[in-house]
From Swiss-Prot:
It comes from Salmonella paratyphi C (strain RKS4594). It catalyses: L-cysteine + L-glutamate + ATP = gamma-L-glutamyl-L-cysteine + ADP + phosphate + H(+). Keywords: ATP-binding, Glutathione biosynthesis, Ligase, Nucleotide-binding. SUPFAM superfamilies: Glutamine synthetase/guanido kinase (SSF55931). HAMAP family: Glu_cys_ligase. It is an enzyme of class 6 (ligase). Pathway: Sulfur metabolism; glutathione biosynthesis; glutathione from L-cysteine and L-glutamate: step 1/2. This is Glutamate--cysteine ligase. The gene is gshA. GO terms for cellular component: cytosol. One of its GO terms (molecular function) is glutamate-cysteine ligase activity. InterPro entries: Gln_synth/guanido_kin_cat_dom, Glu_cys_ligase, Glut_cys_ligase. Belongs to the glutamate--cysteine ligase type 1 family. Type 1 subfamily.
Amino acid sequence: MIPDVSQALAWLEKHPQALKGIQRGLERETLRVNADGTLATTGHPEALGSALTHKWITTDFAEALLEFITPVDGDIQHMLTFMRDLHRYTARKLGDERMWPLSMPCYIAEGQDIELAQYGTSNTGRFKTLYREGLKNRYGALMQTISGVHYNFSLPMAFWQAKCGVTEGEAAKEKISAGYFRLIRNYYRFGWVIPYLFGASPAICSSFLQGKPTTLPFEKTDCGMYYLPYATSLRLSDLGYTNKSQSNLGITFNDLHEYVAGLKRAIKTPSEEYARIGVEKDGKRLQINSNVLQIENELYAPIRPKRVTRSGESPSDALLRGGIEYIEVRSLDINPFSPIGVDEQQLRFLDLFMVWCVLADAPEMSSDELLCTRTNWNRVILEGRKPGLTLGIGCETAQFPLPKVGKDLFRDLKRVAQTLDSIHGGEEYQKVCDELVACFDNPELTFSARILRSMIDEGIGGTGKAFGEAYRNLLREEPLEILQEEEFIAERDASVRRQQEIEAADTEPFAAWLAKHA
């Protein structure tokens, strides 16, 4: 089932320097909660500056949903330490609040209790909040409080020069983008390995269903927790952050221009379902527009091709201008065993898997085959640890045992690991392979099995409160390592100043401004 990558691996072993200079970035979301686990109702802490303009600390959907962002970094340990500093400083500024250590929220009785993220009075700020109003009215606020980790990854120019002979200019843009699309297609085919190993949301609080019927065969504990005994990541299931209305958009990952055309089509295609919500009611705007996507960021995807945008530029226009610059991996649940929601083992694994995905042959995929890849993902998400579980290839009927496919993949990853270790010294990447491959023979070692044991004993709420309290105490005590307190204060003040400048520069009324942007 695994493509034959022996030639590509042999090439890599002859050109190890092609992997020198991999760049990465990390984003982590987490809910602010009170000591009893309920959602914090306070505004974004003043000590953290402006959520609109702060470089490292912002908010996602809700005012209580923090998002931490590292700068681009070539060193995994340095990047994780930077992320830890963001957590350390924030933990000290949250008073009695703490950061929820799980992907799935708990103790939220009503979606109405969730305040949307606020970004001030500028047109840009109001637009961001209106977009979130649209998300709430389309999908419900509870779904939007699910947290995850995003991993941004780019290969060095030396890789593309060695692999494709690119230099600069239009031809380089096309070849590099084609290489990243190959990575993305392989990710859709084999990325289920990420929730298998690292999925950490095998259960949900009963309030999350809000009385809606479900066909999933949940087991229920006395404390009202619903779980699937072999599930890995309900966050990635249809219960979580997915969007069924997007499944027939026909967006494919074969060609830059095709992909962008599909994205642009989706933001211009009217939706009957969303038209029923209405765009405005009693003078209050309910969504930016009633199209399938309000804006491009609404496209749900487990992985995205990206390029840093210029001021006023849409993500797709940035891609057309310069091609794909990096990849955003979006399938990581919060790691409940780390105070910062992610750890070094995971990131080293993702490095290996990304390199494998770009090396392995990846035939073009129709939108139909893209839908078929969802079958494997759903099996792993809902019953990934089930004995005897099999996976297929695309829309074909042949089935293969998951443990065998996983071990075959890791045989290749071990060779990539040897190459990366030869550049950096040590055996860190090979160690990660040895640790993780054991999860295929013993699923009890996976994150989902480990956290489910705690959840069955303590409930989701009890587990979240215990872990959150322990991490709060730990982070508050640890000294900062990279950033200094003065730098946090300077960025707080600078972010507030930047927001004020944006607000002062706005002269157009929001309604007129929105008419141009909706």
